[in-house]
Amino acid sequence: MKILVTGGAGFIGSNFLHYETSAYPNDKFVCLDALTYAGNYNNIKSLEEKENFEFVKGDITDREFVDKLFEKENFDLVINFAAESHVDNSIKNPGVFIQTNIAGTQVLMDAARKYGNIRYHQVSTDEVYGDLPLDRPDLKFTEETPIHTSSPYSSSKAGADLLVMAYYRTFGLPVTISRCSNNYGPYQFPEKLIPVVISRALNDETIPVYGKGENIRDWIHVHDHNIGVDMIVRHGKVGEVYNLGGHSERTNLELVKIILKQLNKPEDLIRFVTDRPGHDLRYAIDSSKVERELGWNRTYTFEEGIKETIDWYVNNQDWINDIKSGEYKESYQRSLKK
């Protein structure tokens, strides 16, 4: 099987490719990534040595480029990880999110229709459901929870999800959607909460926490998320949505304190800052559908996963420093000269 993985140089996509290229040596994986600021060629550089991996630099919004790639490669499956994903950036510049997350999805699905009605999977987020009250721990998002977005980011992902299901119903494109809770693990771009806290704490810098730190997130290790995506694309029912959650709810303040404790750093590094506009209160995912129908279950407890993640960042500070310095942006160009 030949599989197109878009956004494969990003955090979740690169972890997916590291797993898949080893787990399925007889499948061919083509990674398409525009290498925008959060796409890091260093995340997948080691995969270039594998016979079942190929990297292609390109933008999913470039219709002519995407069509030529589909015509050349004859894909059997498309998995779309490509997305602008940082909520704060979406508040500052929503247009970029609309273009990549919605228009890019349309370009990919049009190509999938044109070149053989190719199986298509959309990687989405629990943020399309909006948020839950802090005082109702019994409530969780199910696949039937109505879409009720809060930010330009989540709205762009919801728009893409609606478009995916419209292509299924109107054109018969064989699609699935996965919606995950907050991912954590290696290779996460250091603009997101966990790598920000680790990086700043290692340098004894203050740790900004929105509001009072009471907002709750459900955390899933990126490997567990990607195992779920793998099960869905290979065994899931076409036309269905599947939630993937980590069963690991923590307040943002609890999470920061856990990281500081493991790093032996003082809690007085914490600084409470003005809350994010429209900040979602609580996310919690009900994963019972994918557990029941496909046999998926998480393999990491939060305690195991966060310790391993912290250790990875401690042992890979050069990776973070390359990003901070901008050096990572040159890695792909250097690879072309070899």
For every predicted segment, state its role.
Residues 1-183, 313-316, 325-338:
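N-terminal Rossmann-like NAD(P)+-binding domain of SDR-like oxidoreductases, especially those catalyzing
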Residues 16, 22, 29, 39, ...:
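C-terminal substrate-binding subdomain of Rossmann-fold SDR/epimerase-dehydratase oxidoreductases
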Residues 40-43, 93, 104, 189-193, ...:
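Residues at alpha-helix caps and immediate loop-helix transition turns in enzyme cores, especially N-
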Residues 65, 96, 103, 189-193, ...:
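Residue-level recognition of oxygen-bearing side chains
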Residues 89, 186, 246:
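Short, conserved catalytic or interaction motifs in soluble domains
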Residues 105-106, 158-165, 195-198, 226-227, ...:
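Conserved active-site helix of classical SDR/Rossmann-fold NAD(P)-dependent CH-OH oxidoreductases
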Residues 137, 149-156, 186, 190-194, ...:
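The catalytic Tyr-centered alpha-helix of NAD(P)H-dependent dehydrogenases
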